[in-house]
């Protein structure tokens, strides 16, 4: 429920079933926006005050690079569990498997400047903006030695 004028954007991707369910559930609420597949995820992320996402590698890393406070939801066992532990241990995100706690965590990140700044500082410390170029350089070196 939006109480303070905020808007909630839910991006469902290719999950048409969940998109249909959410559209039915929130059709009356003009502050809840249900989006299916979009090529504009980055733009929606730029507008975020906080992001709720499962701890997949792509969205989690992009959120870190964009310095968006992250609330991780329940992971899919395996790689996402490892991502959840990695991000949590470094204070790059907060998490809970329980919806009510996730809401509390997100509100705290929005309302508590100190908490948000602590996560932001950790994200700036851990991100590696030159990683892609370093990988390309390494690959070039490996290819030139063959």
What are the functions of these language-model segments?
Residues 9, 71, 94:
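Conserved beta-strand positions in the Rossmann-like core of class I SAM-dependent methyltransferases
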Residues 1-48:
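Donor-nucleotide binding loops and adjacent catalytic segments primarily
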Residues 82-89:
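Active-site-proximal loop->helix
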Residues 41-82:
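A donor-sugar binding/catalytic signature common to diverse glycosyltransferases
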Residues 115-129:
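A short, well-ordered alpha-helix in the C-terminal region of glycosyltransferases
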Residues 89-94, 98-114:
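C-terminal "capping" alpha-helix adjacent to the active site of nucleotide-linked donor transferases
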Residues 128-146:
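C-terminal alpha-helical cap of glycosyltransferases
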């Amino acid at each position: 429920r939006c109480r303070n004028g905020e808007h909630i954007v839910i991006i469902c991707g290719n999950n048409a079933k969940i998109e249909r369910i959410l559209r039915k559930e929130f059709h009356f609420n003009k502050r809840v926006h249900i989006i299916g597949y979009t090529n504009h995820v980055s733009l929606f992320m730029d507008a975020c005050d906080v992001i709720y996402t499962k701890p997949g590698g792509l969205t989690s890393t992009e959120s870190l690079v964009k310095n968006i406070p992250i609330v991780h939801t329940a992971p899919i066992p395996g790689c996402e569990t490892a991502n959840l532990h990695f991000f949590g241990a470094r204070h790059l995100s907060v998490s809970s498997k329980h919806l009510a706690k996730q809401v509390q965590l997100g509100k705290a990140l929005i309302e508590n400047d100190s908490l948000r700044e602590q996560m932001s500082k950790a994200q700036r410390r851990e991100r590696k903006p030159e990683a892609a170029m370093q990988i390309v350089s390494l690959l070039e070196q490996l290819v030139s030695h063959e």
